[in-house]
From Swiss-Prot:
It comes from Pongo abelii (Sumatran orangutan). The gene is FARP1. It is a peripheral membrane protein. InterPro entries: Band_41_domain (IPR019749), DBL_dom_sf (IPR035899), DH_dom (IPR000219), Ez/rad/moesin-like (IPR000798), FA (IPR014847), FARP1/FARP2/FRMD7_FERM_C (IPR041788), FERM/acyl-CoA-bd_prot_sf (IPR014352), FERM_2 (IPR035963). The modification Phosphoserine is found at residues 20, 23, 340, 373, 389, 403, 418, 427, 433, 510, 514, 833, 872, 878, 889, 896, 899. It is found in: Cell membrane; Synapse; Synapse, Synaptosome; Cytoplasm, Cytosol. Pfam families: FA, FERM_C, FERM_M, FERM_N, PH, RhoGEF. Keywords: Cell membrane, Cell projection, Cytoplasm, Developmental protein, Guanine-nucleotide releasing factor, Membrane, Phosphoprotein, Repeat, Synapse, Synaptosome. GO terms for molecular function: cytoskeletal protein binding; guanyl-nucleotide exchange factor activity. Residues 40-320 form the FERM domain. Intramolecular interaction between the DH domain and the PH domains can stabilize the protein in an autoinhibited conformation. It comes from the Eukaryota. Residues 471-489, 496-511 have a biased composition (Polar residues). This is FERM, ARHGEF and pleckstrin domain-containing protein 1.
Length: 1045
């Protein structure tokens, strides 16, 4: 081992000039005096598996050793890294930067300390230095080899292909296979060799810096990126793993994330002996504080994990290093541990303010790479592009969610892999660039509360592109953690897995990861946008016709979910009977073919309408003739439309009778392309005709009777009105049928929810008064029964039915004065009474109105009540047992809050989960209104604290905005549920100074959207108001006033 000390430094190996390192101290600070005394030699294993020896005073604090390593590497952003070493009980711990080394490393001659990445930021563009990104890439390579970073074969092959590109340069099949034979990057590498070589061929011309960037771009989307698992058990003794990340504390079962606790929701972390305790902040409408308890192997394991959590919280959430507390005079209680070092905010500010000189370095991965042309290419151009990208990018702490979509992380045991031979990839030593090359202002900003909102992630992984200049980002909310990877029980799967389908053939812009929507695609300046808007025709009819085009694009994509994606999946899996196939697909394919041609005709007419050379030809400036021709054609397709309700019923019956078909459909719903429940797509053709009717009504209202297009528009309106009237009854019946089946998937504890005659009325969140105080429950109102449920801490993310109240004979009254609880109601049934409280007066009034209506219906149809109750969960308790039974259900809830039993994956982006987290409700009437208010088109988006506008393709449906980079994308990149949001017009003080801008805000989360014309602005306001007012029921007539809608 003594030979290690005689090795040349990385700088001398790479031919870099000697330097004295870069100080990481803040301005005005002085380095602590280095303790004098005996020097001790400590061996450090670098990320490339080489070892270096450092002599430091044995009584020096750990920070001295870490600074020595960072100075040796000339590493500016050393705060992301740490030193791992075994303690006296052989437990691997992080070196405490404040404690003397002699107390932490007892036998330094026999200990090898590892220099590794400690803090993984949510976005690798926050790493300012190319050297830092290179070290992160080495960490990813190491995690792959050691089985920590689990992913599917495609992801693994793509990751390795970027590593190979970085190490040996451009594709050469013989050299590739020789290199792969000598270097094992992953245990199952032999099976992936052909795929790795195929992917590597696509990286020709990519520099090592670009390869590192793309490697991190892919890796950061994997669920296990930067995750270190710590074994534990929950209260019930279920074996789980705990981990900590930039977003908060995560819970895993195997390699599958089943829950997460966002930092914003955590009030206190503590440990008592072997018990690790998480105290959550109370809900806004409840004073009850939930404390979760996990049992670890020993006190030392527990304390070690607690320290890691404290450090992650401080590094990612605090603005500056916490000040030490004064030591007690007589007695001390608890651990004195505290975070030491700069926070991420301080690191980003230090780089942004030009606190260092730009560092460049030359890498020489191997002898092969040193003789290839790629190794000699400068990386300054790429660094400049990245720097531009970082100048205006909003930095956010990604929640992950994020969201349903195919899982990329495979389950299984963690394989043990020996590290590569030392010396194969020497540690990098950077060389300095000329003075004055400073980082541009605005390279980074601290995360704001607004930027932490989580939207459901549906990441699309394609071949990543080099970063482009950007102007902002799109995020969503920890308040919506139900839709993220940080959801309790769940934004991913419900747990939203950030598992991209890594297809290198799809060349699209770098996609977003929930909640970060990169602005690297479609950057536009305000001047460019103004120029584009001025070239549009000014006639309102043009924008009405354009709405037909944009919504038709979305409709075709929805049809393709059935005709292309679902049919392709069915053909690969023999899970569907032939009779069901022949009922579904032959009745959708003619519609897809017809509407494909319809869209072409509309777009051709719009192109002529917009063309400068044809601007004066009035015959092109109409759409009524195209609509009339195609609506007449739609009448011949009515036979297929009538079959859709039959297909929906047959599919649900098939799912009920076949477990295999049920699992197949559930797995398909978890794919990113299926962004809504599967049965919703089966009803899309029935809904589409209503939109044609609305468009033609607007055209007829706009055109005077003398207009050339008026007669065609009126004839087309008459035709589509007739079709809508014929299909209306079927549509109402099928919407209720579809909603019952959708709710059935969200509930456990009731198997016979869908019975003839049952109608859904309202669902939403209410607080139920019990012996433990007010506790949040999810209520489901039907025309015969009221169910109340709780959401447990489970992987399935479903709601457990805890009780039912038959409506027949029920009474309802307000009881605020009786119980002293605002917005309180007493529901008194024949067998049981409960007290509930709504979140607001308006919510209470909506529940009272709908419950009373349902009670009246139950009274009128009393002869049906026994049949309905027989189909509900059995409830044979006597009135005397009601109180005890209710108490038992509370105990069940307590157990479910900590039960981490692995169940089948489940969508976590349904309206039930949105209402749970937004503490609101929706009715069947609201769902029917939502069907009539669907819209698609381009919008410009900006944040409250960002400067530029980003162009996005936006689809509004099901109370939710879905965001795409362009209309050609097959699935959304992110989504933002709008229940609970307020819709307003920006005030003068907000300094927007643009036309056609509207604002969406929920608590501290603010988004600005900008339309291209007055008509599209009014349409977006109209449809979004339908979602926001379903929660608030506040209407304002003029959109020019800055008022809540």
């Amino acid at each position: 081992m003594g030979e290690i000390e005689q090795r040349p430094t990385p700088g001398s190996r790479l031919g870099a000039p000697e330097n004295s390192g870069i100080s990481t101290l803040e301005r005005g600070q002085k380095p602590p005096p280095t303790p004098s005394g005996k020097l001790v030699s400590i061996k450090i294993q670098m990320l490339d598996d080489t070892q270096e020896a450092f002599e430091v005073p044995q009584r020096a604090p750990g920070k001295v050793l870490l600074d020595a390593v960072c100075n040796h590497l000339n590493l500016v952003e050393g705060d992301y890294f740490g030193l791992e070493c075994p303690d006296h009980k052989k437990i691997t711990v992080w070196l405490d930067l404040l404690k003397p080394l002699v107390k932490q490393i007892r036998r330094p001659k026999h200990v090898v300390v590892k220099f590794v990445v400690k803090f993984f930021p949510p976005d690798h563009t926050q790493l300012q230095e190319e050297l830092t990104r290179y070290l992160f890439a080495l960490q990813v390579k190491q995690d792959l080899a050691q089985g920590r970073l689990t992913c599917n074969d495609t992801s693994a092959a793509l990751l390795i292909s970027h590593i190979v590109q970085s190490e040996i340069g451009d594709f050469d099949e013989a050299l590739d296979r020789e290199h792969l034979a000598k270097n094992k990057y992953i245990p199952q590498q032999d099976a992936l060799e052909d795929k790795i070589v195929e992917f590597h061929h696509n990286h020709i011309g990519q520099t090592p810096a670009e390869s590192d960037f793309q490697l991190l771009e892919i890796a950061r989307r994997l669920e296990m990126y930067g995750i270190r698992l710590h074994p534990a058990k929950d209260r019930e003794g279920t074996k789980i793993n705990l981990a900590v990340a930039n977003t908060g504390i995560l819970v895993f079962q195997g390699f599958t994330k089943i829950n997460a606790f966002n930092w914003a929701k955590v009030r206190k972390l503590s440990f008592k002996r072997k018990r690790f305790l998480i105290k959550l902040r109370p809900d806004a409408n409840s004073a009850y504080q939930d404390t979760l308890e996990f049992l670890m192997a020993s006190r030392d394991f527990c304390k070690s994990f607690w320290k890691i959590c404290v450090e992650h919280h401080a590094f990612f959430r605090l603005f500056e290093e916490p000040k030490p507390k004064p030591k007690p005079v007589l007695f001390s209680r608890g651990s004195s541990f505290r975070f030491s070092g700069r926070t991420q905010k301080q690191v980003l500010d230090y780089v942004k303010e030009g606190g260092h000189k730009k560092v460049q370095f030359e890498r020489k991965h191997s002898k092969i790479h040193s003789i290839r042309s790629l190794a000699s290419q400068p990386t300054e151009l790429y660094s400049e592009v990245l720097e531009q990208s970082q100048q205006s990018a909003s930095l956010t702490f990604g929640e992950g969610a994020e969201s349903p979509g195919g899982q990329s992380c495979q389950q299984g045991k963690e394989p043990k892999v020996s590290p590569g031979e030392p010396g194969s990839h020497p540690s990098p030593v950077p060389r300095r660039s000329p003075a004055g090359n400073k980082q541009a202002d605005g390279a980074a900003s601290a995360p704001t509360e607004e930027e932490e909102e989580v939207v459901k992630d549906r990441t699309q992984q394609s071949k990543p592109q080099p970063p482009q200049p950007s102007t902002g980002s799109l995020t969503g909310s920890p308040h919506l953690s139900e839709l993220s990877v940080n959801s309790q029980g769940g934004v991913a799967p419900a747990n939203v897995t950030l598992s991209p389908n890594l297809s290198p053939d799809t060349k699209q812009a770098s996609p977003l990861i929930s909640p970060l929507l990169n602005d690297q695609a479609c950057p536009r300046t305000d001047d460019e946008d103004e120029g584009r808007r001025k070239r549009f025709p000014t006639d309102k009819a043009y924008f009405i016709a354009k709405e037909v085009s944009t919504t038709e694009r979305t409709y075709l994509k929805d049809l393709e979910v059935i005709t292309s994606w679902f049919q392709s999946a069915v053909s690969k899996e023999d899970a569907m009977p032939e009779a069901l196939k022949s009922l579904i697909f032959p009745n959708f394919e003619p519609l897809h073919k017809f509407h494909t041609n319809f869209l072409k005709e509309i777009e051709q007419r719009l192109a002529l309408w917009e063309g400068r050379s044809n601007a004066q030809i009035r015959d092109y400036q109409r759409i009524g003739d195209v609509m009339l021709k195609n609506i007449q054609g739609m009448k011949h397709l009515a036979v297929h439309l009538w079959k859709h309700s039959e297909a929906l019923e047959a599919l649900e019956n098939g799912i009920k009778s076949s477990r295999r078909l049920e699992n197949f459909c559930r797995d398909f719903e978890l794919q990113k392309v299926c962004y809504l429940p599967l049965n919703t797509f089966l009803l899309r053709p029935l809904h589409r005709h209503m939109h044609y009717k609305q468009v033609l009504e607007r055209l007829c209202k706009h055109h005077p009777p003398s207009h050339a297009d008026f007669r065609d528009c009126r004839a087309a309106l008459a035709g589509i009105t007739e079709m809508v009237a014929q299909l209306h009854g079927t549509m109402i019946k099928m919407e209720n049928f579809q909603k019952l089946h959708e709710l059935k998937k969200d509930l456990i504890g009731i198997d016979n929810l869908v019975v003839p005659g049952r109608e859904f009325i309202r669902l939403g969140s209410l607080s139920k008064l019990s012996g433990k105080g007010l506790q949040q429950r999810m209520f489901f109102l039907f025309n015969d029964v009221l169910l109340y449920t709780s959401r447990g801490l489970t992987a399935s993310n479903q709601f457990k039915v805890h009780g039912q109240l038959p409506l027949y004979g029920m009474t309802i009254k307000e009881s605020e004065d009786e119980w002293g609880v605002p917005h309180c109601l007493t529901l008194r049934g024949q067998r049981q009474s409960i007290i509930v409280a709504a979140s607001s007066r308006s919510e209470m009034e909506k529940w009272v109105e709908d419950i009373q209506m349902a009670i009246d219906l139950a009274e009128k149809n009393s002869s049906l009540a026994p049949e309905f109750l027989a189909s509900s969960p059995p409830d044979n308790k006597s009135p005397d047992e009601a109180t005890a039974a209710d108490q038992e259900s509370e105990d069940d809830l307590s157990a479910s809050r900590t039960s981490l039993e692995r169940q089948a994956p489940h969508r976590g982006n349904t309206m039930v989960h949105v209402c749970w987290h937004r503490n609101t409700s929706v009715s069947m009437v609201d769902f029917s209104v939502a069907v009539e208010n669907q819209l698609s088109g381009n919008l410009l988006r900006k944040f409250k604290n960002s400067n530029g506008w980003q162009k996005l393709w936006v689809v509004f449906t099901n109370f939710c905005l879905f965001f795409y980079k362009s209309h050609q994308d097959n699935h959304p990149l992110a989504s933002l549920p709008l229940l609970g949001y307020s819709l307003t017009i920006p005030t003068e003080s907000e300094n927007i100074h643009k036309d056609y801008v509207f604002k969406l805000h929920f608590k501290s989360h603010v988004y600005y959207f900008r339309a291209e014309s007055e008509y599209t602005f009014e349409r977006w306001m109209e449809v979004i108001r339908s979602a926001t007012s379903s929660a608030s029921r506040v209407h304002v007539s003029s959109h020019k006033e800055s008022l809540v809608y």
